[in-house]
Each structure stands twice: as structure tokens, then as C-alpha cells.
């Protein structure tokens, strides 16, 4: 991959590099694997919406829950999006993070005996009446219902062009309200396809450092347990809660993604060799298959203000890597200019993103070297779809060119190109 360092930074002195935005835009577009990018793109597959739920069914009602599917089906794949306390005759308002590809949702009033009074409603409906007339099923779920989980995909090369397999770091994150002033955030490292050190953190968007009472983990686990001194050069702070440049609260996830996924104090007598984890179909050479690793963070706030409406959209997970003598952060496109822990020039060019948030707990990330999927003219002038998500009418490449289409692309993997 052509390096941009010498092109976008003009040397003015032995110690100072000046960022050249115009040259950067020329080169990054030249290296792009797509012919065009919709300049309206936000690279979001979800929308945060406020809903009102009117509790008019059952008796002894204690709460209302909202699910992606019917939670009472025996083979349900439902996820809990959000919940709120409510009594019969009352209304509850909730912010929901709704995938654009989701046409319908399910609301359930829950009584003191654990019975669910379930009704379906169109995702575009903002006021939902749950009454004896609208309830379609009553019962108790026969399976445990997980909370809504999103998959986050990162390219390691920001601000340079990547290889667009989006597997340099893959995480799954879910949140649940576990107390009046408490959120529990579950973070799972699924894959590390990078061969260099990456650190990771999670900003609580709009939440100040001083708003947080404590941050701990279930079982006192940490991705930074036993991390060697030699791994502390990208981000050397092992405190679980740190303060961002703008005063916002930031959870320190890990200072070395490879160590976080593979930690074992007795492996190789403390010597640590980086491999690429879970981006191949078998172990061997530089590649290794490993179990995923999860740490659950318990965040206690000083007050409960706004927690009823806390959604996944208020999480800003990002990675940090060294580049051109500095440390650069890779965020979702919506937060690309955030610069939470480090300062650096921020490109404004609208090109392919370096990070994606996919509203799926079981998203299958591309194998190493397999691009996520693009639509491009061949040398013969024929427009072709290719990559790990290339199903016509449901492809990543078509979504790149028109942000209003193919918002369900993540449901259509190419079998031999995904993990």
C-alpha cells in the first residue's frame, strides 16, 4: 500500500510536519477501490428515535420492553432494545436505536408475575398503544433474551487508505440498564486482523468525566490484566476511567488488542508474539483461531438523568495506533473529528470510512484480504460487484454509491469470504 506520509505532510523543519489537505484528498481518492461515494453518506445503519408506549393491558404491570422480534416464540432471535418502568394506565417514553432494515418491532408489558403482553408495531410508528385489543400474545419467554448487540469493525490505517476487509479489529458491544444509576456495557473482542499494536477505548458521548461515580468490571476482569511494560507505548494509561480532551468520560478498554484477546500469564514465559486472530479459516503461520473474550463494565453514574434514553448511538468506541510520529484515533465516521485523547489533523474528505457499526450480534466479518464488497467498472467497462458482501440488490457496494439503498447488506454474506 502506498504510504501517504511523505505526500500529505510537507516538511518545514526537522521537527515539524504540516498537514496538506489538498494533496491528501488527491491521493486518498486515487487509492480508493470504488468509483464513487455518495457524498450524503453518514455510514449509519440505524436511526435513534423517540417512542411513546401507553400501558393499557393486563394487571400488575411493572415495565415495558421493546424487542426486535416476538420474544415468546420458541425459536425467537429477539433482542431487547430498551425497557422502562411503567404502571397500567401510564405512558413511558423511550429512545430506541432502530436498524433501517427493521420494518417492525415488538413491545411487551410485563407484569409482577413475569407475564409478557406482546404487540407488534411498525418501526415508523412513534406512539404505541398496548391494550387488550392490540395484544397478540401473552406468556413467558422460554429462552433467555439477550440485549441488542452491535458489531464494530475497524481499519487500522487511518488516515491512510486501508485494505477494506474491516477486520483489523472486530468488537461486539451491548448495553443494559442494571440499576437506577447503573449501566452495564458488555465488550467482546472477536477478531484482531492487524499485525501492529492497537489500543482501544470507549467514549460515553455527552457524559462528563465528573458525571461518573465508579467504573468496575464483573469479576474484576480487565483486558489490561498483566499487560507487559513493552505494550504501553501507544496508550500508557491503565486506569479504567479516563478523562477526554473535552472533559467527556472515556472507558479505557485495552492498551494492546493482541494481548487483550490472548492474555495468559504463563504463555511462552512472558514472551509475546503477535498473530492475526480469527481472520482465517484455520490456524497456521501468522494466523490463529482463538476464543472470543468478553469483559463487562459496570458504570455507576452520580444521577440517573437521561439513562432511560441511553442507546448504542451514544457509544463511541475507537482505536488508537501510531502514525507519522503521533497517535491517531479511528472513530466511526459520525465521530471522526472527535480527537478524544490525542490531537492530530482531521481530514474532511468524504471517502470510505475506517470504521463501521453493524446492527447485528452475529455479523460475519470478512476474512483477511477479502474486501468487504464494492461495485466498480472492470477494465472492460463492465460494472461488477465483488467482495464479502456483494449480493445484487443487497450489496455493500451499492450502499456506498447510494446511502438510501441496500441498508440490509450485512445480512447477505458471500460464504467463502467471511469468518
Question: What role is predicted for each listed range?
Answer:
Residues 88-103, 109-111, 220-277, 281:
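Short, intrinsically disordered low-complexity segments
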Residues 58-75, 195-233, 238-240, 314-328:
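Extended low-complexity, serine/threonine- and proline-enriched intrinsically disordered segments
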Residues 157, 161-179:
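Low-complexity, acidic Ser/Thr/Pro/Gly-rich terminal tails and inter-domain linkers that flank the onset
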Residues 55, 189-193:
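Asparagine-centered strand-capping/turn motif at beta-strand->loop junctions
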Residues 16-161:
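Acidic/polar, low-complexity intrinsically disordered N-terminal segments immediately downstream
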Residues 47-49, 181-185:
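Structural beta-strand segments of beta-rich domains
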Residues 10-13:
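C-terminal motif of bacterial Sec signal peptides marking the signal peptidase cleavage site
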Residues 246-419:
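A eukaryote-biased signal for long
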Amino acid at each position: 500500500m502506498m504510504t501517504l506520509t511523505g505526500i500529505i505532510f510537507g516538511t518545514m523543519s526537522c521537527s515539524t510536519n504540516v498537514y496538506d489537505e489538498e494533496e491528501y484528498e488527491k491521493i486518498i481518492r486515487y487509492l480508493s477501490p470504488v468509483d464513487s461515494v455518495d457524498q450524503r453518506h453518514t455510514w449509519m445503519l440505524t436511526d435513534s428515535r423517540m417512542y411513546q408506549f401507553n400501558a393499557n393491558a393486563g394487571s400488575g404491570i411493572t415495565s415495558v420492553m421493546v424487542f426486535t422480534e416476538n420474544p415468546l416464540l420458541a425459536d425467537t432471535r429477539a433482542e431487547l432494545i430498551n425497557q422502562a418502568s411503567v404502571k397500567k394506565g401510564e405512558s413511558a417514553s423511550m429512545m430506541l436505536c432502530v436498524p433501517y432494515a427493521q420494518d417492525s418491532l415488538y413491545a411487551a408489558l410485563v407484569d409482577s408475575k413475569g407475564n409478557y403482553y406482546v404487540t407488534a408495531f411498525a418501526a415508523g410508528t412513534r406512539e404505541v398503544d398496548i391494550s387488550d385489543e392490540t395484544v397478540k400474545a401473552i406468556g413467558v419467554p422460554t429462552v433467555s433474551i439477550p440485549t441488542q448487540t452491535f458489531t464494530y469493525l475497524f481499519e487500522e490505517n487511518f488516515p491512510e487508505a486501508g485494505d477494506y476487509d474491516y477486520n483489523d479489529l472486530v468488537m461486539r458491544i451491548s448495553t443494559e440498564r442494571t440499576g437506577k444509576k447503573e449501566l452495564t456495557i458488555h465488550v467482546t473482542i472477536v477478531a484482531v486482523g492487524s499485525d501492529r499494536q492497537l489500543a482501544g477505548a470507549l467514549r460515553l458521548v455527552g457524559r462528563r468525566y465528573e458525571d461518573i461515580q465508579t467504573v468496575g468490571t464483573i469479576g474484576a476482569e480487565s483486558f489490561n490484566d498483566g499487560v507487559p511494560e513493552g505494550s504501553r507505548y501507544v496508550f500508557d494509561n491503565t486506569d479504567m476511567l479516563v478523562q477526554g480532551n473535552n472533559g467527556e468520560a472515556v472507558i479505557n478498554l485495552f492498551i494492546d488488542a493482541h494481548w487483550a484477546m490472548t492474555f495468559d500469564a504463563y504463555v511462552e514465559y512472558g514472551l509475546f508474539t503477535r498473530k492475526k486472530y480469527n481472520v482465517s479459516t484455520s490456524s497456521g503461520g501468522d494466523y490463529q483461531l482463538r476464543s472470543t473474550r468478553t469483559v463487562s463494565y459496570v458504570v455507576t453514574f452520580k444521577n440517573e438523568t437521561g439513562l432511560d434514553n441511553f442507546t448504542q448511538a451514544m457509544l463511541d468506541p475507537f482505536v488508537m495506533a501510531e502514525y507519522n510520529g503521533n497517535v491517531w484515533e479511528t472513530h466511526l465516521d459520525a465521530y471522526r473529528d472527535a480527537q478524544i485523547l490525542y490531537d492530530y489533523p482531521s481530514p474532511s474528505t468524504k471517502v470510505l470510512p475506517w470504521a463501521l457499526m453493524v446492527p447485528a450480534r452475529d455479523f460475519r466479518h470478512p476474512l483477511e484480504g477479502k474486501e468487504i464488497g464494492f461495485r466498480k467498472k472492470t477494465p472492460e467497462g463492465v460494472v461488477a460487484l465483488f467482495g464479502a458482501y456483494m449480493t445484487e440488490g443487497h450489496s455493500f457496494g451499492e450502499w456506498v454509491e447510494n446511502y438510501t439503498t441496500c441498508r440490509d447488506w450485512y445480512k447477505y454474506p458471500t460464504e467463502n469470504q467471511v469468518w
